[in-house]
Amino acid sequence: MNSIKFPVLDRTTKNSVISTTLNDLSNWSRLSSLWPLLYGTSCCFIEFASLIGSRFDFDRYGLVPRSSPRQADLILTAGTVTMKMAPSLVRLYEQMPEPKYVIAMGACTITGGMFSTDSYSTVRGVDKLIPVDVYLPGCPPKPEAVIDAITKLRKKIAREIYKDRIRPQQGNRCFTTNHKFFVVRSPHTGNYDQELLYAPSSTSEISTETFFKYKSPVSSNELVN
């Protein structure tokens, strides 16, 4: 049944009895029906959209795009991920049921791309937010490369043991860099204290000696000293 990696059909048995394990049966059913959640933010996602056409026909892999994270088991991130979008991406990943997989598509998603040099708001790699199963480099990668990444993910699922995958997630989830996001009050509320904004500056607290000291001209000798 599992035609990707291990043949689970025992040909020595009679009467065409199929013998397999529950783990292989689960892997075979999941690799043949991946439901991706498309998270496209930039030009790399246009290349993935080419797979929907009849030329590449990604339906043969059982891919059914979903619009809800609770119905998806694969999230494909394509494009630049900013600091403002990072909490939304993490929330979508957390809402996906287990087991779930991630494909990072494009240089901007993997390393930040050309925006990682002088941009203060770009995440330098989506693996700092969520764990990535398959990296797909390119700017942008071709549709054939996307098919190859999906094939590699199917091979990974075929030889996967479910208990080994959920065990690290039950412990401490630690990635390369922890981005700490805190919900703070917006500073632009429109309610400002008008008395503080338009209060005239008072010089009554400045002493007379200090006022005339800095008002008088300073000689060159005093500047050197």
From Swiss-Prot:
Family: Belongs to the complex I 20 kDa subunit family.
Membrane topology: Peripheral membrane protein
Function (record text): NDH shuttles electrons from NAD(P)H:plastoquinone, via FMN and iron-sulfur (Fe-S) centers, to quinones in the photosynthetic chain and possibly in a chloroplast respiratory chain. The immediate electron acceptor for the enzyme in this species is believed to be plastoquinone. Couples the redox reaction to proton translocation, and thus conserves the redox energy in a proton gradient.
Annotated positions binding [4Fe-4S] cluster: C43, C44, C108, C139
Subunit relationships: NDH is composed of at least 16 different subunits, 5 of which are encoded in the nucleus.
PANTHER family hit by this protein: NADH DEHYDROGENASE (PTHR11995), NADH DEHYDROGENASE [UBIQUINONE] IRON-SULFUR PROTEIN 7, MITOCHONDRIAL (PTHR11995:SF14)
Cofactor: [4Fe-4S] cluster
Enzymatic reactions: a plastoquinone + NADH + (n+1) H(+)(in) = a plastoquinol + NAD(+) + n H(+)(out); a plastoquinone + NADPH + (n+1) H(+)(in) = a plastoquinol + NADP(+) + n H(+)(out)
Protein name: NAD(P)H-quinone oxidoreductase subunit K, chloroplastic
Enzyme class: translocase
Localization, UniProt: Plastid, Chloroplast thylakoid membrane
Predominant cellular place of this UniProt entry's protein: plastid
Record lineage: Eukaryota, Viridiplantae, Streptophyta, Embryophyta, Tracheophyta
Cofactor note (record): Binds 1 [4Fe-4S] cluster.
Keywords in alphabetical order: 4Fe-4S, Chloroplast, Iron, Iron-sulfur, Membrane, Metal-binding, NAD, NADP, Plastid, Plastoquinone, Quinone, Thylakoid, Translocase, Transport
EC number(s) recorded for this UniProt protein: 7.1.1.-
Any one Gene Ontology molecular-function term assigned to this protein's record: quinone binding
GO cellular component, one term: chloroplast thylakoid membrane
A Pfam family: Oxidored_q6
